[in-house]
Amino acid sequence: MRHHFDRRSLLRGGMAVGLGTLTAGGMSAEAAATSSLRARLQADIDAYLARRRRAEGITAISAYVSRFADDPGISVVTGATNRSGRTPIHDRTLFEIGSNTKAFTSALLLKLEAAGRLHIDQTVGDWLPEYPAWAKVRIRNLLNMTSGIPTYSEAPRFMRAQAANKYRHFTPEQLIAYAYPAPGNHLPTSRGYFYSNTNYILAGLIVAKAGGVSYDQQVRQRIFKPLRMRDSFYDSWKLPEDVIERMTSGYFLNPACSEYRPDCTIGPLAPLDGQDMRRADVSWTGAAGGIVSTPRDLARWVRGIFGGAVVPPAQLAQMKQLVSTKTGKPISHVTPDDPGGFGLGLAQAYHPRLGRIWFYEGVTLGYRGVFAWLPHDDLVLAVALNSQPPDGQDQIGALMEELYITVAG
């Protein structure tokens, strides 16, 4: 049986009893409890960095905990911006958050739907007739990964081009071309659920076409600004220098084979092994993964989307409609036997200890950004690390569980 923690009553109730009560040092009981929790969270990430620095190639961890909707939150950081160790990170140091961007893209489309500009059961053919091979694919199928469209990011040709020049700029159309069926370019299609970044590059083009202005402008004006996400950035061309300067270095350590050629001898990204990817061009991720942010802002986004501050209730309900990542069929929720569900840019998982949680890990060539929202506890955890580790070495899920245990007491 899952051990249930009622986060609202546990934390708010405890605070209500302690308000106005001072410790011997003059600190309120509430402040003392928060200070103690911060120290324990700090110890968690310090220990993780010490334990996993070599295996994962990380030099920095940033974490943020939001214990209820109006909680000011707790930020903890550890480590340095690069391998030299000379410059410590702080709570506004920036990380790429990768595929967490997908939920922003879905939200923009659903905001456009709510405004009557499109419907997510329209098709690629309705909006992007230049891709007739995918004309019958619905926008909904793009967003919940049931389109059958291959992912450009695992195409060996694309990976070789990326490895040859990490500063190369890719347009959305160029990315799509790596996956689009053409003479000499036939990646396998899929049935059911298949995670494809191409889906969200197409979705980003539809956002721009239906919205009448660029994806960049829409994500800034319709999401970052109203949610006061002041440490979040997206640029389809090139990140501004002042944003890059605020980023920690990010290290690539995973020269694995392509998903489409799993039996390779040398992975196509091997030339990038060990490199710092901070200044690498992020256009290759686009509307599928191009946002740069902080754990605090990521948690603010999670509160906003699940709290109903981003899209109307009808559209939020659509975002949360799941398909099984095992079968591709609709499910109402995840279970121990069917533990993974994907909505419209959002994912639900079943955890043996934590039960049903909304959880997403975004990974780029040098960064990881992850959140967990536990509705039963009204708790949001967000963490960022500065590497893509070797296959089998990503233990960020264990870190999230440690942080949860610390908060829950």
Can you name each region flagged by the protein language model?
Residues 71-73, 136-357:
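Short, surface-exposed loop or secondary-structure junction motifs
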Residues 22-36:
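C-terminal region of N-terminal signal peptides and the immediate post-cleavage residues
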Residues 55-59, 85-142, 186-198, 286, ...:
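Short active-site loop at a secondary-structure junction
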Residues 38-95, 119:
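Short, conserved catalytic-motif segment at the N-terminal edge
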Residues 1-18:
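N-terminal secretory signal peptides and thylakoid transit peptides that target proteins
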Residues 360, 368-387:
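Short, well-ordered beta-strand elements
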Residues 322-331, 388-409:
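Short, gly/Ser/Thr-rich active-site loops of penicillin-recognizing serine hydrolases
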Residues 62, 367-368:
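Flexible, Gly/Pro-enriched loop and linker segments at secondary-structure and domain junctions
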